[in-house]
Amino acid sequence: IAPSLVGSEMCIRDSNIGDNLSVDCMIDVDRRNNIKVNHTATHLLHQSLKDVLGDHVNQAGSLVHPEYLRFDITHPNKISSKELESIELIVNQKIDEDITVETSIKSLEEAKKEGATALFGEKYGDQVRVVTMGEFSKELCGGTHVSSTGKINKFKIKHDKAISSGIRRINAVTHNQVDLYLEQKSEELGLQKEVEQKKTEEKQSQSILLN
């Protein structure tokens, strides 16, 4: 498929498709918009990781889901809480700046000269699609994105973990999913406090009975 075209794969169920038929193709708009948000956030996360951890960071895997994003990177060490906070802060700063997201078709050579990030080991054609977010991020990418970073609204890293030697996985959420995640964490914390309070009360009761 040429860089300027988008291909879609369909699965036909319980229907016979013949020649010369006219069909209407529709997308789930809400699902697509959520994917756009998380995909653009992934680009911001990628560059923020490089800024905080170093240029050795490369993408080793990625999943853009309507409800969350998952990003695997090359990094030999555990990412500290302070580093995660810095990464999260940078992403949210770029969201607040509401940077315009621009796409363009360029030659692979021109894109590389401009410093566009490419996936290691990926095979590209002579013409590539470049997604640019101001001076902050420039990547070769054929995916769908929001028109500006402000549409992401907010960004929160849920956790990171090692999945193999030298590879770490980061899970994060954006937009309304951030509020849902924080509410869930608050409820879990409240339940934990209740359990601890009951344990304390039981110990106090046992102490009184023994005395």
Language model features with spans:
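Non-catalytic interaction/regulatory segments
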Residues: P66, I73-I163
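Glycine-rich, small/acidic residue-mixed loop/short-helix segments
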Residues: S15-N16, A162
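Single conserved hydrophobic/aromatic residue that forms the stacking wall/gate
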Residues: I1-G7, C11-I12
